[in-house]
Amino acid sequence: MSKTKINDPGAHHAGSGALIRRFLPYLAKYKKTLFLDLFCAALTTLCDIVLPKIMSTITNAAMGVGITLTAGIVLRLAALYFVLRIIDGAASYYMSSIGHIMGVHIETDMRRDAFDHLLKLDHTYYNNTKVGTIMGRITNDLFDVTEFAHHCPEEFFIAAIKIVVSFVILCRASVPLTLAVFACVPLMGVVSVYLNGRLRARFRQQRVQIGELNSTIEDSLLGQGVVKAFAAEDEEREKFAKGNREFEEIKTLGYYAMGAFNTSTRLFDGLMYLVVILAGGLSLVYGRITAGDMVAYMLYVTTLIATIRRIVEFAEQFQRGMTGIERFAEIMDTPVTIGDAPDAVPLQPGPGDIRFENVSFEYPDDHNKVLHNVSLDIRPGERLALVGPSGGGKTTLCNLIPRFYEVTSGRILIDGQDIRHVTLKSLRQNIGIVQQDVYLFSGTVAQNIAYGKPGATREEIMEAARLAGAEKFILALKDGFDTYVGERGVKLSGGQKQRIAIARVFLKNPPILILDEATSALDNESEILVGQSLEKLAHGRTTLTIAHRLTTIKDYDRILVLGEEGIVESGTHDQLLAKQGVYYRLWNQLPGEDTL
């Protein structure tokens, strides 16, 4: 099923300056490491800059200009250069190791913040955003930030030093020649900025498309059972091939843009060398510069061009890093629509009184109200069942209690407290949920049960499993409670997964229970055992059950029938049958079977 991508890179693009400012706080955390890295960069730059001066001195001395060339001078200059190379080696080691590690730390910090923000986003975001896209943003996109964080300050710092120093030294040799050479730089900058923009756009498109491709792969691999059951391998192959082709086309366009960028740079390189050959050669002919100065001049120009070329080569890495920061910023800019109010206080465990006061709800992307002016009192310890046709709002009503979604209007109170004014953590700690679609995490049976109570003892975990009727089958597994359940519990049957999910709630032991037909996947024997355990657990606790089999709720304190008009009927099983209304018709359709 297609999903819309919230805050997709195609929606809005921040400028480079804004993105850099967004990134600076992460870089500032490691400013000591950064400054030392830049100091090492300055040392390596010094070593590069000294060589042309040494060669100029030797050449001029050999030509009889200035000092006389002797073996002692050569040895002293060689010794100086040797010492500089030792310093350069030590500085380069720091830059290559500690500098990169700084980048890794920054990437880790950004990924932590992105994941923390994702945990705060509500169901609407995940309903409308593909998991593959999210995965790409917090993994692949941030990989490039490591290189960006290290090389961006370093490369531009080195380039600035080399360009300024080269300009000063070249001007001392020949101002007109230097101005002629540097006249090429502004034009080169204008062309580079233009082509860089095209390059960045291509990289942004690649990131979007790789997210789409990841989502396609994820759907196909996770749905392998369905794919094989319907012999739909060809359809899945075609879906993948389509996404793969689109990614290939976008990447091809990116390389065209990169080729244009690199070619323009080489053309400007050649133009600068041409200026040196013409102007420098003529200066030699007319005696305006010495041969040594010409050698030094050529070496400094070579250094300058190498610096510019390095910046050009870094442009791809720079754009990848900027794209990663941009997509990171888009996650962080996604608003948290459901969070703690400034005056939020913890919800203390209470009797479990729940009150709906004129509650209406509509999904953000659909203006049709699912619930309209619902008012409802659920007494502490009451067992309430919700029945009705699909789309009637049963699940939505239950999802509003733990604030998976925010009410459009009205309010919900638990023990007299508006749930919007209590902390989310405390609210959800007081509610136990067994969903129809069970999700088990990759790990052991014990770890999945302990999810209901972090830090639970082994004895508590085993007792929860016993109450859920899961102990017998768990002990029969190869490693018992330490058995690895596989990704999403793939190694367990549906009934086994359901019982582990129920065990979580037993361990959590909350005052309010929400059950989405918690026993529907169990065999008859287990259903009886778990049903008895649920009865015991529900005693004295407020319990809401979304019922699909009417036979399971005959003894409930109250049954609500929900329809498009809201709550259409309310009463006990016998009272509703006596009314001979909607519930009566549902009961007589398929008595004892799945009716809804």
Q: Which residues does each predicted region cover?
A:
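Hydrophobic alpha-helical transmembrane segments of ABC transporter permease domains
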Residues: 39, 47, 51, 91, ...
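Helix-loop junctions and hydrophobic alpha-helical segments within the transmembrane domains
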Residues: 114, 118, 227, 328, ...
